[in-house]
């Protein structure tokens, strides 16, 4: 299933479109994690992994934002963001994570 979404949120302000699991809400993400919906959870995790990895690779001369990070740490960060902002899209949570990792890696 391909879905397009203009990214607009507190931490994301762009007219670029995205596809895939990043279009689900944080509330959906938390449901996948808490209701044993592993198929959906793995799909969303793969989307997060790709987004964060792609963001890291898009800055080849910048610091590596994933040094000493595990997937579990990334997903726990997303969990906390989503608990605070359940109506945000997963892309907003993931973008906020990338921005935080970039600021700490400088």
Residue ranges and their predicted role:
Residues 1-9:
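Bacterial N-terminal signal peptides
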Residues 9-16:
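Bacterial Sec-dependent signal peptides at the C-terminal "C-region" and cleavage site
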Residues 69-106:
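Surface-exposed, polar helix/loop patches in the mature regions of secreted/periplasmic/lumenal proteins
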């Amino acid at each position: 299933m391909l879905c397009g979404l203009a990214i607009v949120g507190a931490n994301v302000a762009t007219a670029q479109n995205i596809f895939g699991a990043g279009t689900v809400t944080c509330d959906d993400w938390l449901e996948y994690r808490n209701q044993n919906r592993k198929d959906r959870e793995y799909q969303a995790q793969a989307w997060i992994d790709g987004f964060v990895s792609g963001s890291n690779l898009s800055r080849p001369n910048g610091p590596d934002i994933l040094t000493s990070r595990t997937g579990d740490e990334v997903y726990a960060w997303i969990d906390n963001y989503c608990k605070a902002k359940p109506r945000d899209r997963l892309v907003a949570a993931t973008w906020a994570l990338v921005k935080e990792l970039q600021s700490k890696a400088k």
